[in-house]
């Protein structure tokens, strides 16, 4: 399968305004967001086996269940009460609230529907080493870099609605083991992600006031795209090329 990855960023130029920074951010998304990865093209095009889809959902669960941990770290970086209040809803979006399911619950509906044992999924013992390292690197990034960069790293949400829509239509049309119930996570993110992205974009536009700060925002987004891309590289290497590392989940057709 051929894939055009020729999209490149504009030549380096000083980011003298918020508009210039936003333009650069959108270029980064167009060139580097993981909707361009071959594994996602296979997933959405119906080219994967059920076992390969199981491996994707199992590994992605580690990312999903770590997102509220990441968001709690982001909240801890701010003395500003208004920012903490704004960011707090992200915890409930993923963890849920009393009497209301969250994104992690919806992801487990997906893995249940794919026939994976819930206790095994939640243990994360079968995930790929690269999945664990990439996700943990994301948590470390928001902990160790500036609060501005922590928020900027979430800007992949600018590009998420398109991939969610493609995933919903593609997987429903191509896989007989997928139904609307198990795709509930992605359906909900169609409205949650734009809200989150709008806030994060406004924040970096308002608070990145120098060319250096705007460059740091752009580099934070690049880092996040690398976190996402690395996870798909690992899935492709293990479950398409067949190099499953010791201790990782092995689909039935590969046993």
From Swiss-Prot:
It catalyses: 6-(2-amino-2-carboxyethyl)-7,8-dioxo-1,2,3,4,7,8-hexahydroquinoline-2,4-dicarboxylate + 3 O2 = pyrroloquinoline quinone + 2 H2O2 + 2 H2O + H(+). Keywords: Oxidoreductase, PQQ biosynthesis. Pathway: Cofactor biosynthesis; pyrroloquinoline quinone biosynthesis. Its EC number is 1.3.3.11. One of its GO terms (biological process) is sulfur compound metabolic process. Ring cyclization and eight-electron oxidation of 3a-(2-amino-2-carboxyethyl)-4,5-dioxo-4,5,6,7,8,9-hexahydroquinoline-7,9-dicarboxylic-acid to PQQ. Belongs to the PqqC family. This is Pyrroloquinoline-quinone synthase. It comes from Cereibacter sphaeroides (strain ATCC 17023 / DSM 158 / JCM 6121 / CCUG 31486 / LMG 2827 / NBRC 12203 / NCIMB 8253 / ATH 2.4.1.) (Rhodobacter sphaeroides).
């Amino acid at each position: 399968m051929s894939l055009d990855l020729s999209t490149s960023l504009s030549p380096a130029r000083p980011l003298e305004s918020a508009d210039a920074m936003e333009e650069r951010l959108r270029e980064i998304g167009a060139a580097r967001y993981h909707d361009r990865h071959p594994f996602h093209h296979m997933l959405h095009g119906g080219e994967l086996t059920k076992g390969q889809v199981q491996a994707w959902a199992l590994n992605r669960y580690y990312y999903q269940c770590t997102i509220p941990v990441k968001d709690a770290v982001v909240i801890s970086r701010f003395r500003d009460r208004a920012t903490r209040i704004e960011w707090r809803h992200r915890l409930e979006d993923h963890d849920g609230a009393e009497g209301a399911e969250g994104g992690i619950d919806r992801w487990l509906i997906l893995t249940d529907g794919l026939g994976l044992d819930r206790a095994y999924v939640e243990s994360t013992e079968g995930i790929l080493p690269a999945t664990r390292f990439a996700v943990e690197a994301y948590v470390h990034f928001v902990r160790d870099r500036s609060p501005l960069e922590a928020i900027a790293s979430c800007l992949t949400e600018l590009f998420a609605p398109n991939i969610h829509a493609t995933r919903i239509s593609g997987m429903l049309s191509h896989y007989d083991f997928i139904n609307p119930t198990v795709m509930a996570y992605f359906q909900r993110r169609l409205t949650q992600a734009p809200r989150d992205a709008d806030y994060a974009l406004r924040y970096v536009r308002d608070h990145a006031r120098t060319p250096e700060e705007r460059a740091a925002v752009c580099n934070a987004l690049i880092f996040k795209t690398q976190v996402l891309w690395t996870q798909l590289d690992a899935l492709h290497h293990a479950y398409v090329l067949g190099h499953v590392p010791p201790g990782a989940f092995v689909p039935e057709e590969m046993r």
